[in-house]
């Protein structure tokens, strides 16, 4: 880690614990525990909600969160496998009707700190997560501080919280001698920032894997004391004053390297010596945490440079589209690319392939956690992926139908759509949609990137229905498919959510529209009342 200039885990812990948030939170927890009821009060403009600890017989059994019906966390990023939480904590949260009691109490507040000790901490984390993950976020800021809280859920829950950009709202204070926060069940995973404390100071870790590693080290090296679970008041008030005092390094001379000096101070803050075996293990854990946290950030920065390097490929496709739109043949770039094999088509095809490889690599890196959990929520990548998909997917559809084996190939939307587009669709669904405005001109690119694939299916339905050999029953079934697409396409055109190439005189859509009109006239459908169509069903990809 020589390329790292500073190690800040010990400094971060010192700064955090010195703020009134932690002393006031613990005082609130203590009052709630004594009264055995939820305490809500204001201190210096901050509303504290302290949830009391509840003696429980059994913790450690996981249960899946409901994904249908009354969903507790609708705004939480969904992952596979299913996010799970401790069954006893979930049951207690529902029994105590915490969410019903808070909805009115917190109206008009600006900053709310949800806090709790032991099982009260787990309930506090659950409550804060419920507030933060609603479809409509609360009007106030939410922060959660727990003391000696048991772990709440599985790895999928931890990952979902991180990807939803909610992890920074949680801070868990844990004594290195307290057994309660360290679950023996390997299925449980931490989330948020962990502030490990001892009489010597504290260290902050915010990577789930590093927190688990620290738990394992403490299980084998730290002195285990059942009374430690009740000593958080001592730690909070002692450490908050310790920050104001000067620190002296106990391990001889301070290392010249500022990063190594920071690591050494962090090891001592947890009460370990830099020279003994336990201290070496803690040092390795802190260094690993730094490396794990930095690696995705650095890779994301490198990827931004790689994105810039493929920009010419995207511009090549844009220029190709513009040239096709202006051509005398009155065909859009979809039809040009599908029908012809000109020299300029070869060049744009190479750009299409280059972009596909780049985005396939990005998707793979996201899935293997090589990038930050919230990578896909960054504005740069939201816009870049959207622009890429709007411009390139029609060419991928054209290429598919250009080379398709009609007998065995099926359709593009029948399991042949590249995974990258399905993932980008999920990314876009997680973005707040701006209020819809009426377009005064046609879009620069068709807003439904699967429009041409749906048209190809509708073309086959119409071709089959037009055949003389088509029996009335089969023709009726085909009409039930054609009419929804017609309604959907008309809606897109009316709202001007298609590009001009869709309405070009000789485009596939214009030809299909003319053939449909002729077929209706021939069959006497023109004056019939068409069936009512669910437009949303028609527009499903």
Curated annotation (Swiss-Prot):
It is found in: Nucleus; Cytoplasm. Induction: By benzothiadiazole (BTH), at site of green peach aphid feeding (GPA, M.persicae) via TPS11-dependent trehalose accumulation, and H.arabidopsidis. Induced by P.syringae in a NPR1-independent manner, and by salicylic acid (SA) in a NPR1-dependent manner. GO terms for biological process: aerenchyma formation; cellular response to trehalose stimulus; defense response to bacterium; defense response to Gram-negative bacterium; defense response to insect; ethylene-activated signaling pathway; leaf abscission; leaf senescence. GO terms for molecular function: lipase activity; transferase activity. SUPFAM superfamilies: alpha/beta-Hydrolases. Its main location: nucleus. GO terms for cellular component: cytoplasm; cytosol; EDS1 disease-resistance complex; nucleus. It comes from the Eukaryota. It is an enzyme of class 2 (transferase). Changing residue 118 to A: Loss of antibiosis and deterrence against green peach aphid (GPA, M.persicae) feeding, but normal leaf senescence and plant defense against pathogens. Its EC number is 2.3.1.-. Belongs to the AB hydrolase superfamily. Lipase family. Probable lipase required downstream of MPK4 for accumulation of the plant defense-potentiating molecule, salicylic acid, thus contributing to the plant innate immunity against invasive biotrophic pathogens and to defense mechanisms upon recognition of microbe-associated molecular patterns (MAMPs). Participates in the regulation of various molecular and physiological processes that influence fitness. Together with SG101, required for programmed cell death (PCD) triggered by NBS-LRR resistance proteins (e.g. Part of a nuclear complex made of EDS1, SG101 and PAD4 that can be redirected to the cytoplasm in the presence of an extranuclear form of EDS1. Sabilized by direct interaction with EDS1 in infected leaves. Part of a nuclear protein complex made of VICTR, PAD4 and EDS1. Interacts with VICTR. Interacts with EDS1. This is Lipase-like PAD4. It comes from Arabidopsis thaliana (Mouse-ear cress). The lineage of its organism: Eukaryota, Viridiplantae, Streptophyta, Embryophyta, Tracheophyta. The gene is PAD4.
